[in-house]
Amino acid sequence: IRSFYEKLVDTLPVIVNGRIDKKGDWDVFEFQGKAGQDLVTEVQARRLESPMDPVLKITGPDGKMLAFNDDYEDAGNGVNTHHADSYATLKLPTDGAYRVHISDTVRGGGEEYGYRLRISAARPDFALRTVPSSITLRAKSGGGSISVYVQRKDGCTAPIPVTLKNPPAGVSCKPVTLTGTQSVARLAIKCDLPSSTPAFDL
């Protein structure tokens, strides 16, 4: 038997700390939306050390499902190999009451099945990571290369220019711009430094 806990969300953005108390429960949160709004819904559970494997769905004013997510792979959470948390983006099609439904994938529940829900406007952003995180440039060797990976958040599609920040004299690279569909850039670094040069940041 499924039971429901329903709550009206008065204003957005909102963060809700909740719990699936009993097996088979669904928590439902209702909010008023406007046509054309770009919204993000995110459920954190495993990242908070909860045993919950969340499942998320969003229904519109007519009750039809508009978005669904079980497992969302978060590239920024490298230590987690089981991406069990949920995330969905949605452009609202019309004015009216929308509902966010949350449960456990295998319908588990209990005191330890806590979660954190975020409902907010999309906040496009990005984070960069380099591989390797450090590099040895041998004197007079001509340089080396690094790969720069971008993690885009909340629908970010802006072009991202990538280059070295304030390199010392004798070190240079040609800037590269990541388009909205690219996730990695390779920087070729030229080096013309003496062998006695100490370590420095790029």
Report the location of each language-model feature.
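Acidic, Ser/Thr/Pro-rich low-complexity intrinsically disordered segments
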Residues: 9-114, 118-173, 201-202
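Blade/loop signatures of beta-propeller domains
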Residues: 2-9
